[in-house]
Design a protein with these regions (language model features):
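Short, well-formed alpha-helical segments that are part of the catalytic scaffolds
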Residues: 12-27
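A conserved acidic beta->alpha catalytic loop
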Residues: 22, 40-49, 70, 92
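Membrane-interface aromatic/basic loop that binds lipid-linked glycans or pyrophosphate carriers
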Residues: 271-345
Length: 345
C-alpha cells in the first residue's frame, strides 16, 4: 500500500464531505493501493455519521474509528498507529487536496527514488478564492532535492515548513511508540512537535515548488485568543534546544532566536483579541511571558535578528525587552480602535 491518508475529524459536518470527495475521487483513479483513516474525536454534530456513511460507500478504501475527545495531536497519532501505507498524508477535515495531489506525488516518488519526505506548497482557501501561502520555500526550481540542513534552517526561520499537512513522508519516519501523552495539553505547536520528530528520522528530501493542498482559512489565532499560546510553543523550543548538537547548524542560536521571538511577537499581538477585564490582568500576562527563562535569554538577540522579524512584532519585542508593558497595551488598543473605526465607515 502506497498511501495512508489520516484525517482527524471533529465537528466539521459543514466541510467533511467536500474534504473526503477531494481525496476519494483521486484514489478511485489510481492503480496504487491507498487507504483513508478517519478518526472521529467525539464529534457532537453529524460528522461521525458522515464518516460511517462514507465507510459504507467505500469499504475497501475507508476505515473509521470513533474516539472520545483526545485532542488533535493524540487523534493524529492514533491514526498513525493504524496506518499501513508506505507514505503518510495528513489532511485536516475542513481542508481540500488539489486535483493532481496524488498524481504529482506518485510521479515524484518514482522519479526521485522514494525520498523520505516530499515537501510542497499550500494554498490559503476561503471557500471561493485561494492564494499561495508560501512559494520558493527551499528553491525557485519546480522540483529540487534539498539537503537536510537547508530544511532545518527554513523550519527555524519561519512558518513555511511548520504545517504537518504540507508534506508527505514515509511511515518509518514516525517514532510510532513515542508517548505523546505528555504533550496532550499543547494547544498550539502540535505540528511543529511532530515535524521535529520527522526531521530526526528523515534523510532525503524533495521539494515541489507547487501548491497541492488547500488550507481553509477562518480559524486559529487570527480570530481567537489562546492564553496558552506561548507556553505551548515553549514545549517546541525545548525540543529544538535538545537537538542543538544533533542538528549541527553553525547558526543555530541565530535561527532559534528568530523562532522564539517571532512566536512571542504573535503571542503579544493576539492579546488584543481578548476583552481584558482591566489593564492589570493584561500586564500580568505580558509580564509572565517577559520573565520566562527562554525568552529572557533570546530577547537579548532582538537587534541581531530584527531584519527577520515582522515590523509590527519587532516594535512589541523592543518594548517588551525594556519592560514597557503600558506602551504595548496602548498600541494594541489603538490598533483595535483603528479597526473599529474603519469598519464603521
Amino acid at each position: 500500500m502506497l498511501f495512508s491518508i489520516v484525517v482527524p475529524v471533529y465537528n466539521v459536518e459543514k466541510y467533511l464531505q467536500e474534504c473526503l470527495d477531494s481525496i476519494i475521487k483521486q484514489i478511485l483513479q489510481m492503480s496504487e493501493a491507498c487507504e483513508i483513516i478517519l478518526v472521529d474525536d467525539g464529534s457532537t454534530d453529524s460528522s461521525g455519521k458522515i464518516c460511517d456513511r462514507y465507510k459504507t460507500m467505500y469499504p475497501d478504501i475507508i476505515r473509521v474509528f470513533h474516539n472520545s475527545n483526545h485532542g488533535l495531536l493524540m487523534t493524529r497519532r492514533f491514526g498513525y498507529k493504524k496506518a499501513k501505507g508506505e507514505y503518510i498524508v495528513n489532511c485536516d477535515s475542513d481542508d481540500l487536496l488539489e486535483l493532481d495531489f496524488f498524481k504529482t506525488l506518485v510521479k515524484t516518488i518514482r522519479e526521485y527514488s522514494r525520498p523520505d519526505m516530499i515537501i510542497f506548497n499550500q494554498y490559503l482557501y476561503d471557500g471561493w478564492n485561494k492564494k499561495v501561502a508560501f512559494d520558493n520555500i527551499l528553491s525557485e526550481k519546480d522540483v529540487s532535492v534539498v539537503p537536510k540542513q537547508d530544511v532545518l534552517r527554513q523550519f527555524l526561520m519561519g512558518n513555511s515548513l511548520v504545517s504537518i499537512c504540507g508534506a508527505t513522508y514515509k511511515r518509518t519516519c514516525i517514532d510510532i511508540n513515542k508517548d505523546y501523552s505528555m504533550y496532550a495539553h499543547v494547544s498550539n505547536g502540535e505540528d511543529s512537535l511532530q515535524k521535529i520528530e520527522l526531521f530526526d528520522h528523515a534523510d532525503t528530501f524533495v521539494y515541489l515548488n507547487k501548491a497541492l493542498y488547500n488550507y481553509r482559512m477562518g480559524s486559529g489565532m487570527t480570530t481567537k485568543f489562546d492564553a496558552n499560546y506561548y507556553s505551548s510553543f515553549k514545549v517546541v523550543f525545548k525540543e529544538i534546544i535538545r537537538r542543538k548538537e544533533k542538528w549541527s547548524l553553525s547558526d543555530f542560536e541565530y535561527l532559534l532566536s528568530i523562532k522564539v521571538l517571532s512566536t512571542v511577537g504573535r503571542a503579544i499581538t493576539q492579546t488584543r483579541l481578548k476583552k481584558w477585564k482591566n489593564y492589570k490582568d493584561h500586564k500580568k500576562y505580558l509580564q509572565r511571558i517577559r520573565e520566562d527563562d527562554i525568552l529572557t535569554e533570546y530577547i537579548e538577540n532582538v537587534d541581531m535578528i530584527k531584519r527577520q522579524i515582522q515590523k509590527s512584532h519587532l516594535i512589541f519585542l523592543i518594548l517588551l525587552k525594556k519592560y514597557l508593558y503600558c506602551m504595548i497595551i496602548v498600541l494594541l488598543n489603538l490598533k483595535n480602535l483603528s479597526e473599529k473605526i474603519g469598519m464603521e465607515k
